[in-house]
Curated annotation (Swiss-Prot):
Complex and partners: Part of the signal recognition particle protein translocation system, which is composed of SRP and FtsY. SRP is a ribonucleoprotein composed of Ffh and a 4.5S RNA molecule.
Organism: Rickettsia bellii (strain RML369-C)
Binding site for GTP: 109-116, 191-195, 249-252
Molecular function as annotated in GO: 7S RNA binding; ATP hydrolysis activity; GTP binding; GTPase activity
EC number: 3.6.5.4
Protein name: Signal recognition particle protein
A cellular-component GO term for this protein: signal recognition particle
Amino acid sequence: MFKTLTQNLMKIFDRLVSSGLLTEEQIDAALRDIRVALLESDVALPVIKNFVAEVKQKALGQEVIKSVSPGQMIIKIIHEEMINILSSSEDEIKLNLNAKPPVNLLMVGLQGSGKTTASGKLALCLKNQNKKVLLVSLDTYRPAAQEQLEILANSVKINSLPIVKGEKPLDIVKRAMAEAKLSAYDIVIYDTAGRTQIDQEMMNEAIAIKKIVEPTETLLVIDSMTGQDAVVTASSFNEQLEISGLILSRIDGDSKGGAALSVKYITQRPIKFLSSGEKLTDLEEFDAKRIASRILDMGDIISFVEKAASIVDREQAEKTAAKLKKGKFDLNDYLQQMKSIKKIGGFGSILSMLPGSGKIMDQIDQSKLNSKIIEHQEAIILSMTPKERRNPDIINASRRKRIALGAGTTVQKVNILLKQFKQISDMMKKASNMNPKNLLRSGLGKLFS
C-alpha cells in the first residue's frame, strides 16, 4: 500500500543521513521533497501543510542543531509527526461494545468499497472473542448482495438473518432486532446498502436505519485505492452520519497510501481496522506506530510476529529449530516453511514488514513473490520420494526429469527450486551470526533476483 511513498521517502532520508551537519536551507530542500512525495501519494493538501509545518518547527529547534546526527534526528521527528497524524487514543480505537446486548454495529460506505467483506471479517474477529454474532444485510438494491453476506457468514459458521425477498431495509432492521433479542445475540452487524456515489436519498435511508438501530459504532469502510476521493467520501459520511470510526480496505492493493494519512486527519475519527485480501482472517487492528514504521521502512516486526504466532505450528517450528542447530535442513522442512509463508500472506507480505525492505523491493522480481510460485514448489516437492526430500544431494538429472513429470512442470523449474533451497539452507546457517538487515539484503535480495 505504501510502496511508492516509502521508496520516495527513503531517497530523501538517504540524502539527509549522508550529510554531516544540516543547514536550514538543506532542511527546507528536504521538506520540499517530502511535500512532493506526499502529493504524489494522494495525501490531502491540508494534511501535507500541517505535517511539513510541524516537522520544520521541530527540526529547527535547538535539540536538532546540537545533535550529533541531525539527519537521523529529523527522520525521528518525521516518524513522530506521522504517528501524530495517524494516531487516536486507545479508547477511541477500541470497538465500543459497552451496551446491553445485543450491541449493534452499523457498517456504511460506497458500493465496491469492500464493506460486505469487511462486515464478515469483523464478525469473525468478534466470534473469535467468544461473542455470539448475527450478520444482517440491508442491501436490497444490489443483485445478490444479501446472498453474498449469507455465503460469507456460512463459510465461517456465523449466523446471518434469513433472507425474505421483497422486504424493505427498515423492515429487515425490525425483524433483526427481534431475532437478536429472542436468540440472545451479543452483537449484531448491519451491512447497509453501498452507494455508487454520495446519494442523498440513500444517505437518508442510512440516517433512518441508524436512528432505529442506535449503534454503539458506525463504521465507514473506505477503499484505500480511491486516493483523494476517499477524503471527500469520508467527510460527507461523517457530516451526515457522525461516523465513529474507519476501516481501510484493500490495503494490499497497488495504492499510493494517501488515504490512510488523510481520512483520519480530515474527519478526526479513528482508523480502527485495516482490511486486506478476500480471506476473512485478513483484518488487523490499526496501530499508528506500526503503520508509521512501515511507511518509513523501519519495518513492523511486531505485526509480523503476531501474525506468524497465530498461524505457525509451534511444535513443528521447535522441531525445525532443533534441526537447524544441528546443521540439518531438508526439503521436508523447506516445504513446511513454504506452507507457513503462504498462510502468513506470501513473501511480499513478509518483506513489507521487515526493516529495510523498501530499498531492495526494486531489486526483486515481483512476479517471484506470487503465492502461485509457492504452490508450484509444493507440487514439485510432493513429487519427490521421502528419501529425496531428506537427501536433496542425491537428486541427479534422471531424478529431476521424473520429478518434473510428476509435478507437471519443467526440469528447469525443478532446478530453480533446488537452487533456492540451497540458498535458503546456506542463509539459515549464517542467520545466527548476521545482522537482520544484512541478512535481508544478502539473502532475500539474491533469492528473488
